[in-house]
Amino acid sequence: MGAKEATVRGPGASPVHRTCHLIPLLLAGMLTTGLAQSPVPTSAPRGFWALSENLTVVEGSTVKLWCGVRAPGSVVQWAKDGLLLGPNPKIPGFPRYSLEGDSAKGEFHLLIEACDLSDDAEYECQVGRSELGPELVSPSVILSILVSPKVLQLTPEAGSTVTWVAGQEYVVTCVSGDAKPAPDIIFIQGGRTVEDVSSSVNEGSEEKLFFTEAEARVTPQSSDNGQLLVCEGSNPALATPIKASFTMNILFPPGPPVIDWPGLNEGHVRAGENLELPCIARGGNPPATLQWLKNGKPVSIAWGTEHAQAVAHSVLVMTVRPEDHGARLSCQSYNSVSAETQERSITLQVTFPPSAVTILGSTSQSENKNVTLCCLTKSSRPRVLLRWWLGGRQLLPTDETVMDGLHGGHISMSNLTLLVKREDNGLSLTCEAFSDAFSKETFKKSLTLNVKYPAQKLWIEGPPEGQSIRTGTRVRLVCLAIGGNPEPSLTWLKDSRPVNDPRQSQEPRRVQLGSVEKSGSTFSRELVLIIGPPDNLAKFSCKAGQLSASTQLVVQFPPTNLTILANSSALRPGDALNLTCVSISSNPPVNLSLDKEGERLDDVAAKPQSAPFKGSAASRSVFLRVSSRDHGHRVTCRAHSEALRETVSSFYRLNVLYPPEFLGEQVRAVTVVEQGQALLPVSVSANPAPEAFNWTFRGYRLSPAGGPRHRILSGGALQLWNVTRADDGFYQLHCQNSEGTAEALLKLDVHYAPTIRALKDPTEVNVGGSVDIVCTVDANPILPEMFSWERLGEDEEELNLDDMEKMSKGSTGRLRIRQAKLSQAGAYQCIVDNGVAPAARGLVRLVVRFAPQVDHPTPLTKVAAAGDSTSSATLHCRARGVPNIDFTWTKNGVPLDLQDPRYTEHKYHQGVVHSSLLTIANVSAAQDYALFKCTATNALGSDHTNIQLVSISRPDPPLGLKVVSVSPHSVGLEWKPGFDGGLPQRFQIRYEALESPGFLYMDVLPAQATTFTLTGLKPSTRYRIWLLASNALGDSGLTDKGIQVSITTPGLDQAPEDTDQPLPTEQPPGPPRLPLLPVLFAVGGLLLLSNASCVGGLLWRRRLRRLAEEISEKTEAGSEEDRIRNEYEESQWTGDRDTRSSTVSTAEVDPHYYSMRDFSPQLPPTLEEVSYRQAFTGIEDEDMAFPGHLYDEVERVYGPPGVWGPLYDEVQMDPYDLRWPEVKYEDPRGIYDQVAADMDAGEPGSLPFELRGHLV
């Protein structure tokens, strides 16, 4: 590499070789960001074969400082401003520094990547002392880093548009960012360099950095408008200068305005012409504002601008008028920087004709007299000449005159005097104006000459004078005249006063005045009259100039005004009244008469008065004494005319002042249904009308302004709504006027639906006794037949009440029951309907008391239990009766001591059914295998049953085997289980076909089933069927092999049979007489058996003990399991001790036996399965706890339907809702004094329970 060259490598570019000049700050070839290698001097110092010279690079470049050592084995390191960097090629603390080259060749070049200002320093290459050479230090190499300015800050702001006024001086400031060396700044204005610039260099934000601040003084011109003013900064680190600029908006005035009009210099224009004057102003920023002035006053301020050409234009459009003569029109231009307004003007010279020609003077004149006229024109420019014409004949004027007119014009005047004759009448007299300047136009004024002369004749046509005409008649009068100029006006007069056509429309119009009509030389005018009294003897005249004609009418009319006069206006009962009837005027006279409401009154004649319309007057008087009944009556006066056959009437209404009086039709009582509306009407007469209607109820005054449920109507009537029973009663009305007061009582009768107030529930009676079920209600009205009764059975079925007596008195109804029977017990419903919905309904129970009836099947009930003192037994005694039953127990006739801890009794009362469960713990064969007697007692008697407690044994044979269905291949069987011996039993069917010997067996599954269908049979075959029961101790009926039936299956062509009747049970035939040999064998067998009895007895006792232990364990486990699983929550029990127990009840005609293994008898699902706490009263609340299913299974021990019959007709209730039906009756314990207004109108369920009407 040459000593005067450096290599610069930019990113992604090939190396570029430039000549290196050693002048500071002018190393343009080094201003890149690539690798810079310092030039190596041609003659290196001692010990070095290569060293770099001073180097200048741009910030961000990579530079290599050369160091070639002649003693390669020495330790070499670089020093930066005296700081040793160390011999390590990866220089610690300087990640951008590294040593490059082959150390064996003595190459220790320092490589600096991405140079920044911190690398601007002096560098030395130092060689340590070694065996090969001494310690060496190279001359210093100065590395200069050039930093370019990043930004120029221009004031005003760069990128903006700056508005200046042309010719004014402005200051622009430009400040560079930090750089090294300081940048140079110049200003360029519109492509020209600004000379007046001052700059200063200042220290930058860091050491070795500088910034330049330059200030330029600029005076813009109009040519600079829209140009850029640029600040340009440069330094050696920049390849191209950086710039900042703003746009100059130079304001300067526009050029002078120009009016583009051909007649600009002369200004000649014709009046009426539409003149358009364009004005243009060029240049200016902003563009010029133009306006037009007329005689110094603005007339148009509208203008347009073409920005591209910088031209403003405005057009003045005007219609020239005569007054515009001599007007000065000016166009002015200016903008915001104009020193003064620029103006261009024009003066108008207007030519205009006269706007009008006028003839002064009258053209109407009597014949043979002179007419003097003057013709005058309006101002014109230039002047005009005048001439006269009469018809087609030109007349000579008397004289002519010219005067100055308006707007620089002239006025012409011509006078004319003319003698008129009759033949000149109607000719046209014309004044004409003319001039050469207006040769195409004619201006003239014409008048018609009117020569006056009088008419020749005048007369009236109409009815003949003296003829009588009835008022209201339409009369036509016509006035006629011949000749005359002007045409005769024909004026009508009545009694010397002009007759005018009325302006306002009248139906019909009494006067219709026609217009003058002409027919040839005859003129006429019609006057039509509807004749009235004012026209009587009136004189109607017609005038035409000095001529006149007249006629007179005679009118017949009835009284024009018939008036009754009274001597007093304020009358009170007993006052005297004098009335006078006066007929003002009529023609001919009339006859007067007076009556009151059709009754003729005695009257006397009164002194007549003068009558208008030249008619006759009349008057008569009458005397009256008035009462309150006369108020409003009319006294009528009638005036009758015989000639006219017409009567005119007038009346006087009597105004009698009297206090209020209630009329006979006044209502005294009003009926209304509760919650409805009521109107208490008022029929009162008073004069003046009552001032107030005051209503009081129970001593309290009702507000006249109204209330929530009442208002007083304008006529005094009282209106009520949402009426309640509390509103029932008398209402007092107090009426008052200025004459006095009056009072009346009105009764309001409020009808409301019945409400049951008392209904005793339950109602009790002994069997055979008599009782009344009493139902007391609150209702209005109380009707004799409003009570009815129903007896309810199951599902509220209505039953017959023919054996009961119904009666009622007032608000109480009774249902009388005589010789009460158990079948009459149950629910009864009292229904009350008084015609106001809804009807009231109340439920009541009739309880018929009877002595206990114990369920005691015959001949005996057995209960089995192991007698080894390890098990327990429960005896169940059930009875019916009312009232509640008490139970007692005996064993073998001896009262049972229930204080003994081995005995526990639980009592259960459910309606009429009562139960006692006696549990015996640790059953002992010696003590407890006995006959127990249960006695049920109440106030009406007692009853008892016996229960035998026995030991565990084989089961008894089943009972009642019968066939329920038969088919060709099957037979359906049903039976009743016998005593199971205290152990679980199962059933087995043995059968045989009689045609084919041999027995077949079939086990019944499930084991506890009591019905079974035997299949696999042959059609048309006779079978014999046996049923056996067995338990762990053996089979039932081993001697006779159980009970049996015989059947014959039908053929395939026969229909299957269903039967509910048991077939005859076929017993095995009796044994034949025993022969001797078999008897001997039997005796021998007995002897053998006697020898083995001891061994067999012992074995039997052991086996029995083991069975008892197993049964006891299983029974206890089963009882505990049932207790946990089947707790009965709603039962009512009585127990002496808190022990679990079971129940046994006897109701079969056959003996039944119960074991203690898994024993859980249960009652049938009757009323005793649910609690009657909500439906019955008087039931004992007793604590009882035993397995919940205790009563479901005992149903099988009761007799079949019909064996016992119904002991008590019980009301069936929903087991899930033990309330009586809510809407069927009213609560007998309700609050009696409530009224409907105080009750909640919500649903029944929203009331408290005690107000819902439920039986509890």
UniProtKB/Swiss-Prot annotation:
Disulphide-bonded residues: C67-C125, C174-C231, C279-C331, C375-C431, C479-C542, C581-C637, C775-C830, C877-C934
Q: Where is this region: Disordered?
A: 491-516, 1048-1071, 1112-1143
GO annotation terms (biological process): cell adhesion; gene expression; glomerular basement membrane development; JNK cascade; MAPK cascade; myoblast fusion; podocyte development; positive regulation of actin filament polymerization
This protein is called what? Nephrin
Q: What does this protein do?
A: Seems to play a role in the development or function of the kidney glomerular filtration barrier. Regulates glomerular vascular permeability. May anchor the podocyte slit diaphragm to the actin cytoskeleton. Plays a role in skeletal muscle formation through regulation of myoblast fusion.
Tissue expression summary = Expressed in kidney glomeruli. In the embryo, expressed in the mesonephric kidney at 11 dpc with strong expression in cranial tubules with podocyte-like structures. Expression is observed in the podocytes of the developing kidney from 13 dpc. High expression is also detected in the developing cerebellum, hindbrain, spinal cord, retina and hypothalamus. Expressed in skeletal muscle during myoblast fusion such as in the adult following acute injury and in the embryo but not detected in uninjured adult skeletal muscle.
Which UniProt keywords are given for this protein, alphabetically ordered? Cell adhesion, Cell membrane, Developmental protein, Disulfide bond, Glycoprotein, Immunoglobulin domain, Membrane, Myogenesis, Phosphoprotein, Repeat, Signal, Transmembrane, Transmembrane helix
